[in-house]
Amino acid sequence: MIKLARYCIAFLIIAGCGGEGPYQITAESQGTKIVVGKFTRSLLESDSSFSWYRSNYDAFSPDSASIAYLSTAMQNVHFIVVGGTWCGDTKLELPKFFKTVSLSHIPESHIEMYGVDRTKKSKDGLTEKYGITNVPTFILFSDGKEIGRIVESTKNGMEFDLVGLLKQK
């Protein structure tokens, strides 16, 4: 019986260590960390390799009138966000997006975020499914239907572009 218990424990340890999580992180020779797969912003907040996230988040001050509008208009909106932790545009726009949705009280459960490699490929075919060729891409959904996108960079600022997309809906 003890022998069986040891085998079961060994199996569980091996099985637990062999599985691949929802994302992978690879480090390039110059130190850039690339996240590929589904992850949350807590990864960006907790890993010092992504210091650009906190500094750009803190530096951004969105328009208060836009935040007031978005607080009501975005409550039933869901997002798919695709970015590259290696990409300059992602480093600028992703923190602004998260500050905007945080101040608008959008729940984390309404946001799915995926990292891609330098070829802009995801682990699960998401980039092909949604035709993503540039990052970052912010896709907005309402009632399961796509209502708009922000691709690569904003035109008027994150909060203003989100307001514009929601008013077109």
Model-derived features with residue positions:
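Sec-dependent signal peptide recognition
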Residues: 2-10
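C-terminal motif of bacterial Sec signal peptides marking the signal peptidase cleavage site
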Residues: 13-16
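Non-globular targeting/processing and membrane-anchoring segments
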Residues: 18-64, 68-73, 163-165, 169
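Thiol-based oxidoreductase modules, predominantly thioredoxin-like and allied folds used
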Residues: 79-85, 108-122
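Conserved redox-active cysteine motifs that mediate thiol-disulfide chemistry
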Residues: 85-93
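Thioredoxin-like thiol-disulfide oxidoreductase module
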Residues: 113-134, 165-166
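Non-catalytic, surface beta->alpha helical segment in thiol-disulfide oxidoreductase systems
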Residues: 134, 140-169
